[in-house]
Amino acid sequence: MIYHLSIGKPDQVEELTKLIHRLSSEFQIFCFQGEMGSGKTTYIKSICSAFGVDDGEMSSPSFAIVNEYSGQNARVFYHFDLDRIEDPSELLRIGWEDYLTSNNLIFIEWPEKAMSLIPEDAVIIRIGHESDVELRTLEITTL
């Protein structure tokens, strides 16, 4: 299924958050694709916040590759930023398969760096810019 959303600013994500919440009952992995500065990290932070993660606990995992957040009801979220990896095998060395089998929600920025390791049932969220600098179009694809 394909969903299309238009969002005025990355912090105006209520509709996206509701959709991700609904999809999270069926899907575990959410991949965010978009140019640098398109709002990937901001969207993920907003979604995690809606799941009860403390805003102060969240940061971009650019240097750590993965951050772990705790939300409501002891729910755990993994936030990956794959921009800095040079080879997908780097993920295997940090326990990638354990993350995938954890049954926790996984949000991935720059998934194209390791598509060979991302399960086929991952939700792909493509973020595009319109001519208006603030407007983002999102295409969310599920199996």
Regions found by a protein language model. Name each.
Residues 54-68:
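Short beta-strand-centered segment that lines the nucleotide-binding/catalytic pocket of NTP-utilizing
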Residues 1-18:
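N-terminal pre-Walker A segment at the start of P-loop NTPase domains
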Residues 35:
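P-loop (Walker A) phosphate-binding loop of NTP-binding proteins
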Residues 30-32:
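Hydrophobic anchor at the beta1->P-loop junction of P-loop NTPases
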Residues 21-27:
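Phosphate-binding P-loop
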Residues 40:
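Conserved lysine of the Walker
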Residues 1-3, 89-91, 97-143:
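Short phosphate-coordinating micro-motif centered on Lys-Gly-acidic
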